Design a protein with these regions (language model features):
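Compact, glycine-rich, soluble single-domain proteins
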Residues: 1-73
Length: 73
């Protein structure tokens, strides 16, 4: 399952990050690491981006970036 598939209020654990380069490095710095719990906390009015809570912070990710984060319930 991909992160972008989470509904608001749904929580999952990060299983894999398929993002490389500067964006992948930044996501890792923000806490998108294997085993971390992540919750979808909001969606913008047009559906992109989504807001996620991870490591005590709320991060907004575009759907194209969230699609590269694999999660499991």
């Amino acid at each position: 399952m991909r992160l972008r598939e989470l509904s608001v209020g749904e929580t999952a654990r990060v299983t894999e990050l398929r993002q490389w380069g500067a964006m992948g490095r930044r996501l890792r710095e923000l806490g998108f690491l294997e085993g971390e719990s992540v919750t979808c906390v909001g969606v913008s009015p047009l559906g992109d981006p989504h807001a996620y809570r991870i490591c005590g912070a709320v991060i907004a990710l575009r759907n194209c970036d969230a699609a590269r984060v694999e999660v499991a319930p």
